[in-house]
Each structure stands twice: as C-alpha cells, then as structure tokens.
C-alpha cells in the first residue's frame, strides 16, 4: 500500500553526507498557505557550502536539513484565503518568508527581517521534495513562455536585479564585476540590459572569464595572470577610462577583490557588496570618504524583484537557458551534489527535476 503521509527529500544529514530520505508531506495549517508540487530546483552555491562545510557565517547545520531553495512548480493545494492562485497554476516561489507584521516587511525590505524563515538555511528545510508549503504572498505565476527550469532560476536572477537596483545603474554606465560565478554573471548581464556600456569581469579562472565573455562581457581580466607590477585597477582603467568604474559589483567576497574594487571605483561611484567572504577583512577605508564612494551592501532580494525578474525573462530581454549546464533527475540528486561540489569549474547552473 502506498504511504500517503511521507515523501522523498534530499536531506543534508551532516557535512559531506546527503541522502534521499522520507519526510512528512506538508498539510495546510493556515488559510494563507499554498502547497507547491516542485518541478525544478537549481543547486545554489549556498547548498554546496552547507554540504561541504556545514555552515555559512552564523548559520550552522546542527540537525538534518532538506536542501534547495531555487524552485518552481505547480500549485497543488491552496488555503481558503488564497484568491490570486488556483490549483494547477505554474509558479516560481520566493524561498524567504518574513514576519508579515515586522517593520522590515512594512518598509518593503523584508529581506532584512531578522526572523525571516529562508528555505535550506538552518534550521529551516528547503524545497528539494515533491511538495513544499509556503505563503501565498511569495508565490508568483509564471507566463506560459517561461519554463519550469527558468522559473527555478528566477531566484538567483532576483539577487542580480536587486544588486542593480541598489547600484542605480544608468544608461552608458561603466561597470566592473568581481567574481564570474552564477550571481556575478547574472549581475553583469542585468547591468547590460539596464543600459551599461561597459561590463568588465575580473576572476582568477580563465574558463569562468570565457563564460563571462559569452554572456556579454565587454572586457575580461584574469587577476591571477597579470605581469609583475601590473595591478587589476590599472588594467581596468586602461580599458574603460582612467576615471574608473561608475559601479562595482563585488560578487566574490574575497579581500583582494574588495580592495581592488575600492581602487577602481571612480570618485562618487558605487560599490555593491554582493559576495560574502571572511567575517573580517582589511581594506583602504580612507579611500571611501576621500572619493565619496557609496559602499552598498546587498542581501538577497525584496519587494518587486521577483516580479521584475519574471518580466525580464518573459520579455526575452534576458535568457536564462544558457546558464543551465547540467540536469539531473530527482533520484540522481545526490550524484548532482557530488558532481557540482567536486567539479565546480564545469558548472554554471545544475537543475534537479522534481520527483515523479
């Protein structure tokens, strides 16, 4: 007899060990809740970091946790107060649920709510299951021309959208992106769509830089392969002008990149710090006031970012399909994590299909 109370899930048992494990199927307990049948989930760098290290900053995996937060699917069940969605709707889901009455929620900056419940961030389970329960306010209908795979990648795209909004990108802007990982690639691509004239990518790895070139980089700089005495900022300024960059997206979290970003940003320019690295680093703070730089933190996304991301993809101003390099069935998800963690250079985005 089929067990209708449990479902398979991809569970991080402890650092280095992921299993396919049975967990309870969620039930509606609040009239504003929605249950989604998950159809596609992207593997995020945070998933890999929890898998390999068991923690990110102060978020520590202390008990088994379902992984995954970049997901899309079909509405399977709705609470009685849900009027904007119906069973069968194709949707993307925002994985962070704030306190609906928090000051941050009222300000439209719910990503800063200290009580935010974010999928696959300890102690909260993620979306790599067949059915996942969330709140109606954080479920977005997908247009018919946006696939489930693209719907899953609305989540990282929203990070890039948020970063560009914080940067206040203007037409003709000169931008530099440090770190050519998925978020960096998307941040640069969005900057181009928003009207940036130059998008320079900086990374240590040549294959990542070649990928950045394929995604529209106007210039690439291999910071690990410069002649003795040549600095990153001097190479960038030679390419885009000696005044430097209007906007710097720091997407690596690495101290040398933070320092170089401060050097290369023009007077009056903006640095958007997207990457999270060591808790403490050293950088030339005196440059920030003397150049009147805006040093802007960026954390996930908030009001309007998901909707704008879906519109950008649906309008075909930006395609997410080229970012998908690997696909796995749900039953092969453990292999997907092992492959992604052991061979990251061959991967931009891995998609895991939802369970059958």
UniProtKB/Swiss-Prot annotation:
Q: Which reaction does it catalyse?
A: xylitol + NAD(+) = D-xylulose + NADH + H(+)
Identify this protein by name: D-xylulose reductase
Residues noted as binding NAD(+) in the record, renumbered to the chain: 179-184
Q: Name one GO biological process term.
A: L-arabinose catabolic process to xylulose 5-phosphate
An MF annotation (GO) of this entry: zinc ion binding
Instruction: Spell out the Gene3D superfamilies in the cross-references.
Output: Medium-chain alcohol dehydrogenases, catalytic domain, NAD(P)-binding Rossmann-like Domain
Which coenzyme or cofactor does it need?
Answer: Zn(2+)
Keyword annotations of the record = Carbohydrate metabolism, Metal-binding, NAD, Oxidoreductase, Xylose metabolism, Zinc
- Give the family this protein belongs to, as stated in its UniProt record: Belongs to the zinc-containing alcohol dehydrogenase family.
- Residues annotated as binding Zn(2+) are 44, 69, 155
Record InterPro entries: ADH-like_C (IPR013149), ADH-like_N (IPR013154), ADH_Zn_CS (IPR002328), GroES-like_sf (IPR011032), NAD(P)-bd_dom_sf (IPR036291), PKS_ER (IPR020843), SDH-like (IPR045306)
EC id:
1.1.1.9
Q: Which domain of life is it from?
A: Eukaryota
What turns on expression? Answer: By xylose.
Q: How is the cofactor bound?
A: Binds 1 zinc ion per subunit.
Top-level EC class, please? oxidoreductase
Q: Which gene encodes it?
A: XYL2
Annotated metabolic or biological route of this protein: Carbohydrate degradation; L-arabinose degradation via L-arabinitol; D-xylulose 5-phosphate from L-arabinose (fungal route): step 4/5
